[in-house]
Each structure stands twice: as structure tokens, then as C-alpha cells.
Amino acid sequence: MFKEFREFAMRGNVIDLAVGVVIGAAFGSIVKSLVDDIIMPPIGLLIGKVNFADLFITLKAGATPGPYATVAAAKAAGAVTMNVGQFINSVVSFVLIAFSVFLLVKVVNRLYQKKDAAAPAPATRDCPFCATAIPLAATRCPHCTSQVPPAD
């Protein structure tokens, strides 16, 4: 049983999948850092919040009455919050990852795309008398019954 598992695990597809998962996790952390540390701070400055992740709505005050400066302070007080900023960060991260994967798949598909084969020779020709499509080997048109010269 161990031998079968080892053979399964060493097949190319499983190893490729494992490498893809590891690289995907690393890529996800890079995109998360890009969103949290590079993209969202300028947007946060534009809307008046320096830390965009701390944009939240207090649904129910905790033991200590609000307002709370951060999500962490609200959670420490036992408040129930709707963390809008963290959700927006996650959406932006998802969009960036999805767009990056789209571009990657597009490039890979372009690399592996087979070149268009030469168009196959036509199997029919037009009858010179009635313009109906007839097989190349036909010597008489089935539509108008005219005799047609053999195909070249």
C-alpha cells in the first residue's frame, strides 16, 4: 500500500499540483502585502482613514462604550463590528489574484496554442449550371441533373 501511495505521489501531476499550491500560497501573501501596504494606504488617506483595515461599523457597543479607534480596540471592549475595510482589502486582493491568474493562463495558452493547420481541401464544388454544392467526384448535378465536367 505504501508503494502504491509513493507511486501516486511521485507522478508528475501530483508534484505539479504541490508546486502550484506552494507557489500560489506565496503569491497570495505577496498580493496581500501589496494590497495592505501599497495600494490601500493612499486610498485610506483619500477617504480620511490612515489605516483602511480599521474602517468598521459598530453594530453593538461592548462593555466599554465607543467610539473605538480601531477594530482591535472594539473587539477588546467586546463590541460587535462589521469590518468593512478588511472586507474591501480581501476583495481587492481577490481581484488582483484573479486578474494575475487570468494573465498567466492567457500567456500559457498562447504558448501552447497549436498553429492553425492548413485548411483542408474542399469536399464540394459548385455546379456551373445551378450553383448548388455538389461532391467533387460528381459528374452529374443531383439538383438540376446537368452533366458537369470532372473536377481537376
Swiss-Prot record:
Location(s) in or outside the cell: Cell inner membrane
GO molecular function terms noted in the UniProt entry: mechanosensitive monoatomic ion channel activity
Domain of life: Bacteria
Keywords: Cell inner membrane, Cell membrane, Ion channel, Ion transport, Membrane, Transmembrane, Transmembrane helix, Transport
Transmembrane segments: 14-34, 84-104
Topology versus the membrane: Multi-pass membrane protein
GO CC terms of this entry: plasma membrane
InterPro entries: Mechanosensitive_channel_CS, MS_channel, MSC/AndL, MscL_channel
Function summary: Channel that opens in response to stretch forces in the membrane lipid bilayer. May participate in the regulation of osmotic pressure changes within the cell.
Subunit structure: Homopentamer.
Family: Belongs to the MscL family.
HAMAP family recorded: MscL
Listed name of the protein: Large-conductance mechanosensitive channel
